[in-house]
Amino acid sequence: MRLRNKPWAKEKIAAYPQYVIPNPEEHKGRWNELFGNDHPIHIEIGTGKGKFITEMAKANPNINYIGIELYPSVLVSALDKLIENELPNLRLLNVNAKDLTNFFAEGEIERIYLNFSDPWPKKRHEKRRLTYRAFLELYEKVLVDEGEIHFKTDNQAFFEYSLVSFSQYGLVLTYVSLDLHNSDFEGNVMTEYEEKFSAKGNRIYRCEVKYPPKHQKAGL
């Protein structure tokens, strides 16, 4: 994806610390205090322009959402949506997902959304894929016992790779669709990217996986 540079994006993000949390490591293990409740927390890694997570937060007021996006020029669009909607159960982070354990304590997150992540198709870039084993290990550290990953992509090769990666790690597949928009799945919330590519007739792939119970993985 080619990004359009917005030199003013960082300045705008810095002007809204109540929405884009500037020092997320200070809230590690205490995100419930920031939200002012003990509702479950769901995060989206690669939140993009924010349509998905904004709509999810609107539809589910009893769930707290955190959108993570590395690029300020993209995140600023999600910030605009949050400013407009003033959602108390949504906050944003302008950080790198590889540092996830710096920001969240063990068992602090209930679910992770991966929507249309960069497939990094070249073999030498495999370690950058958000469904690579090292990332699955990272997610397990912050997720609750039997925590979930919900994954969507329009890239068949990346989807197949991810299914294998999930299986090899021991994740349990609880839902899969090879053509989401022609399935019986209800409640799908589309991203901007998803709207664009599904309108062209592109097939959307989706799956849900969960980690096995930790005592089971430990062989107890």
Swiss-Prot record:
Residues 124-129 are annotated as: Interaction with RNA. PROSITE patterns: SAM_MT_TRMB. One of its GO terms (cellular component) is tRNA methyltransferase complex. Pathway: tRNA modification; N(7)-methylguanine-tRNA biosynthesis. S-adenosyl-L-methionine binds at E44, E69, N96, D118. PANTHER family: 3-DEOXY-D-MANNO-OCTULOSONIC-ACID TRANSFERASE/TRNA GUANINE-N 7 - -METHYLTRANSFERASE, PENTACOTRIPEPTIDE-REPEAT REGION OF PRORP DOMAIN-CONTAINING PROTEIN. Its EC number is 2.1.1.33. GO terms for molecular function: tRNA (guanine(46)-N7)-methyltransferase activity. The keyword S-adenosyl-L-methionine applies. Gene3D superfamilies: Vaccinia Virus protein VP39. The gene is trmB. SUPFAM superfamilies: S-adenosyl-L-methionine-dependent methyltransferases (SSF53335). This is tRNA (guanine-N(7)-)-methyltransferase.
